[in-house]
Amino acid sequence: MQKINIRGIEHYYEWVRQPDSTTPKPVMVFVHGWGGSARYWESTAAALAEDFDCLLYDLRGFGRSLITESVEGELSYELEEYADDLALLLDKLELEKVYLNGHSMGASVATFFINRYPERVEKVILTCSGIFEYDEKAFAAFYKFGGYVVKFRYNWFLKVPFADKLFMARFLRRSLPSQISKAFLEDFLLADYEAALGTIFTSVSKKAVEVMPQEFAKITVPTLLVAGEYDQIIPAAMGREAASLSDRVEYFEIAETAHFPMLEDAPTYLQKIKDFVGVS
């Protein structure tokens, strides 16, 4: 297991690339979403490995990038800080310029990154991203529910028949193989409490409502925003509205998919990515 220290946290990372390749390839970095890990990007990365060296990593507090007590409380869970974590990761791996693909919360991190470090990105894919309006009552209810979801997590959930399917139902239009659904549930149960709760408040907040439209409007890097037609987490309309704020953003919607279009309809997703980045 490869790890690299970023601001006191041992971050898990892995390379997905063709083992027999001797020719240097451009690097594509994948950023996962809330409660997940780099694991769900592995099949997408493997499919792109002919044209890219793919770098996957677990965000601070998620997956295999565990937060130790010695640094807990020293770092915030603002998404801008996660963007800075990514910059430090690239520095340590001596990567000057990359392609970037972020999903959900990871897409918000990627958006902050390309505006803070535009010179470090060739092109970016934002998978399931968008902007939303502030509703005080709805947000308060969401925080309360989110707090319960994060607080009451037990490993015995993994032993409950079909728990993984129930957990993933809201995220999907098309079902996924059981081993993938179980991996999602495992990652959710593994997430650090403070990180999981903290990023709920920074991802869905009055500040995010005000800041994210400005961030989309500032985009100068060539960007593809991919939405799932039936996404209930970040509805396609929110992605369409976000894309309209910058002429550098191309919008693409995948039919009959929800919050994980790269897994629900991999052929369509991969073909669009390849067309966008200019590979066969």
Feature map (PLM): residue ranges:
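Conserved HGGG/HGGXW glycine-rich cap/lid loop of the alpha/beta-hydrolase fold
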Residues: 15-68
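Acidic catalytic loop of the alpha/beta-hydrolase fold
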Residues: 230-234
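Active-site loop/oxyanion-hole signature of alpha/beta-hydrolase fold enzymes
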Residues: 56-101, 105, 271
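Flexible "cap/lid" loop of the alpha/beta hydrolase fold
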Residues: 115, 123-155
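Catalytic histidine-centered segment of alpha/beta-hydrolase-like enzymes
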Residues: 257-270
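Short beta-strand/loop motif that positions the catalytic acidic residue
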Residues: 219, 225-227
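Alpha/beta-hydrolase fold catalytic core
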Residues: 1-29, 49-52, 91, 95-96, ...
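Conserved alpha/beta-hydrolase catalytic His-Asp/Glu region
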Residues: 136-137, 156-217
